[in-house]
Amino acid sequence: MSMPKEKIKMVFICVENARRSQMAQGFAEVFGKGEVEVFSAGSRPSSQIDPLVIEVMKEKGIDLSGKRPKGLNDLPPVEMDYLITMGCEETCPAVLSKKIIEWDIPDPKGKPIDVFREVRDLIEDRVTTLLKEMRSQK
């Protein structure tokens, strides 16, 4: 009997964990189902996910309504394979990770829904590319 393959652990980090990192986690959980264990967190977590994020992700068939922003202390104390920052605007947190990737993605906070859609589509594209690269390195 072969041992089950260990899932790749990835964490997406932004400031509030209310917009960008939540969208990235949502896409990674759907597109990497069964292959990756996905986390997200914020260096200064907000009290709730931005309602526009919930709305634009629902347009893609991904329901984030039950999720809530988490802080770095909420992450499990394990080494991550990938740490993806969304442009933290500050030094990014010390989370133990084998590989750190910086995505400079603008925060759509306070912008119209069309900007949220643009950011969502950019994140979807980045997550898809990351998962392809990850699979090719297996």
Give the location of each predicted region:
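Phosphate-binding/catalytic loops
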Residues: C88-K138
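Short, well-ordered turn and helix-capping elements at secondary-structure junctions
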Residues: G42, G87-C88
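Alpha-helix C-terminal capping/helix-to-coil transition sites in glycosyltransferase folds
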Residues: P77-E79
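Conserved active-site segments centered on acidic
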Residues: S2-N73
